[in-house]
Amino acid sequence: MVDGWIILDKPLELGSTQGVAAVKRNLRQAGYGKCKVGHGGTLDPLATGVLPIAVGEATKLCGRMLDASKVYAFTVAFGTETDSLDLEGGIVATSDVRPPLADVHVTLGAFRDSIDQVPPAYSALMVEGRRAYDLARAGETVELPSRRVTIHALTLDSWTGSEGAVETATLTAHVSKGTYIRSLARDIARALGTVGHVTMLRRLKAGPFAIEQAISLDKLNALGQGAPLEHVLLPLEAGLVDIPALDLDPEQARAVRQGRVLTGLPFEDGLYWARLGTVPVALVELSDGNLKVSRGFNLQDVAE
């Protein structure tokens, strides 16, 4: 049984489901049989970077990854807006306005907050049972409601053009779940009195996983050709490092695995991952000293 995470540095034009399929294929070729595999958050085909792929018991944590904040680097080209808000779409608006650098700095400051954002028409959101991007590609008008998202940080890394007329801006954004970077780029451009679209998008972090932990598709494919699994697999608990651990004794671990509520624990309320030694037992919620299991992990090394 294989349990853990493979963090793929997703290449351009590879879909998230194709990334999952590549992991399944390589595990099968390496002799690990049929493994349960899922990803922790869709990444656009035209984006690159961190794609957390869960294997085995780690798939129980995919929901946490979907809810986690993300960090992206992206480039906005001013003067042209496309229907997809990236390089793939057709041009729907143009502008001769190129914002002054000083205005870019001021405008970015206004976006570092909770904001209302309308997702792109070309998105995987469901509209009356159909994907929004399917409707958009069919030429239908797609109207999506705005949603509240949070931009925790937004910085200007580099730019082209002149101080009086910025042509492109490369930014880094730390954002809450549900944030669309293409929409953020659109809204920044419009706030600057022009239009724009994304020409580069790279995810640098998803939840606890950073780009430094990601492997290339070539390194993943080496697994199917005999490379050691430990060269690509992170342990299940790598997806839990952003929350505190709670150490259990063998009797407590047995109770948790049986679904019993533990009481009288001297810890603050909140989310923990319970462990026996170094082995994850469960994702748990503590309230008033009472422990309740949110997700149990069926790992063989847990003491009975």
Curated annotation (Swiss-Prot):
Catalytic activity line of the entry: uridine(55) in tRNA = pseudouridine(55) in tRNA
Entry keyword tRNA processing: yes
Entry keywords, A to Z: Isomerase, tRNA processing
TM segment ranges: none
GO BP terms in the entry: mRNA pseudouridine synthesis; tRNA pseudouridine synthesis
Record Gene3D superfamilies: Pseudouridine synthase
Active-site feature positions: D44
Pfam families assigned to the protein according to its UniProt record, in alphabetical order: TruB_C_2, TruB_N
Molecular-function GO terms, alphabetical: RNA binding; tRNA pseudouridine(55) synthase activity
Tree of life domain: Bacteria
Keyword tRNA processing annotated: yes
SUPFAM superfamilies, alphabetized: Pseudouridine synthase
Assigned EC number: 5.4.99.25
Role summary: Responsible for synthesis of pseudouridine from uracil-55 in the psi GC loop of transfer RNAs.
Entry similarity comment: Belongs to the pseudouridine synthase TruB family. Type 1 subfamily.
Protein name: tRNA pseudouridine synthase B
